[in-house]
Amino acid sequence: MASSIKDVATHAGISIATVSRAVNTPERVSPETLARVQAAMEALQYRPNALGRQLRAVRTGLVGVVLPSLANPVFAECMQGIDEAAASAGQRVMLMTTAYDREREARAIETMLQQRVDGLVLTVADAAANPHLDRLDAERVPYVLVYNDTQGQPRMPVRCSVTVDNRAAARDAIRALLALGHRQVRMLTGTLSASDRAALRHAGYRDALQAAGIVPQPPVEIDFNAEAMAPAELDRLLAPPCPTAVFCSNDRLALLTIRALRARGLRVPEDLSVIGFDGLAMGQWLSPTLATVAQPHRQIGIDAARALARRIAGESVPPITLAHRLLPGGTLAAAPMAPAGSSGATDSTDSTVFFPTSDTQGASR
């Protein structure tokens, strides 16, 4: 079997991106690194795939799109924007989803390359440490990230992306809760390792609480694809010190939270305030309306498709950060004098109160 650029990187003890720079722009690497790459290439008898680059120079008019899920309206709205902009540019679109699974992500990218797409628009689990993006860089395949924030992140090369500032947006959400008197704010999120967006929102949650002198509680993580919150997960969310507000890493999880709280006999926002992240239209159809941080999903898709067209044409395109908006909604209220579940009496020496649990609320099972 012929050696690959990944084999060369492993043999030399460096990244795929560094091997790519040594091959394509040797002036950008140190003489020592260049020597290591050349030695590894000779040892493995590796030759850069000039034929592959020539094939990709022939345009197909096909754009690949890799997204986590269309069940989440966030990505469906983004896809609408991508499709509109691509159609206006005379491009065809090929879509694959990954279900937040890194192996499926790898297979989707490989399939796209086999189909000889001109470029890719994609959302990946982690843009900081991603061998698939390193491979695209190495093979000079144009791509644009959506929702992955690559600016100012440690260990992360700056890559072309279209997103909001997730960390700053989460800080704004928590500051809105703090302004209403909330001091016990819990976070519900999908699996942090499956989404660098959720990880940045968690960082913003921590930033805002710590700036206010409040020790953040550990987040409660559940499956991004969950259709309902398990009783044990709700117990963890409501465990002492009892929260008066819940920040959810996306609107879909916020809607699951509200449904679970109501099934437990708790009122939103009278007993607990809930704020999500995304700005889904369905959240504004509820009564009360969902408080959320809104992202311009369709515009993210449009801007990403346009940026990709520029990259395919050979232009250098910097990351694009769009504005977010805080929608207060009806699920926010001032912090209650005592969290739900208390007897109404307070004791200045012991203000611990308890919510009903799945063990005491049989109907919630």
Placement of each model-derived feature along the sequence:
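N-terminal helix-turn-helix DNA-binding module of bacterial transcription factors
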Residues: 1-59, 336, 352-356, 360-365
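Hydrophobic packing within well-folded, soluble alpha/beta domains
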Residues: 5-14, 19, 29, 37, ...
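Short beta-strand segments enriched in small/hydrophobic residues
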Residues: 16-21, 56-71, 176, 184-191
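Bacterial carbohydrate/catabolite-sensing allosteric modules
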Residues: 43, 84-89, 137-365
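Short gly/ser/thr-rich secondary-structure transition/capping motifs
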Residues: 43-49, 103, 124-126, 258
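Generic recognition of short, well-ordered alpha-helical segments
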Residues: 50, 76-78, 107, 131, ...
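Alpha-helical recognition/docking segments in bacterial nutrient-uptake
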Residues: 58-175, 179, 241, 365
